[in-house]
Amino acid sequence: NGVLNVWLLFSSGPFWMVAGLICMVLMPLGGVALMGQELEEGNHELLLLTKLNRWSVVLGKLLTLWGLSVVTFVSILPYVVTRYLIGGVEWWHEAACAGTVLGGSAMVGAGAIGASAFSNLGARIGVFVLFMASMLGGCAPALLASAGVTKGCGILYHLTAMAAIGCYTMMGLSLARSRLRLSILCFEMKPSVMLLGLLVFAP
């Protein structure tokens, strides 16, 4: 039992399958439209003229999106507590599934926000697919290797899982942040291009 163990989540019955589908897939995908309204209408220029910096803008987007997933997940927690009290489940198993849902929601939401910073719909889809592929390619081998070292989901595994969540959440937000620049000098490479390259080579 461990965080980011997707197989554990989707093999734990219909409740966790539905919770994972809603909180890790459907709600985070709403982030694909979040940055577009700021960039296409020029609102980001007004925001950057205030005391807000680029990190504040993208973090606010993520907290809003992730907060909706958390609120939705919390609303169904009484069912989990009821299952635990009647003795049908183990608390560590439920905690691992909950951590997978919340951590996965943060990573997918950050990737969706990063992809939404591109104006073209095809580019958004392509960037999001690249982000998901990089996330799977970067997280899965590290998690499997750490689980193999400790012969299970121990402390090393969970430290690796927390690092993976933090890494890919920050990469998604950095991608969105890179598109909020007011100007780029003619000899500079676009920061978003460098971050896309980072996604390619990150695994």
Q: Could you say what each language-model-derived stretch is?
A:
Residues 1-43, 54-203:
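Hydrophobic alpha-helical transmembrane segments of membrane proteins
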Residues 50-51:
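Glycine/proline-centered hinge or cleavage motifs at structural transition points of membrane proteins
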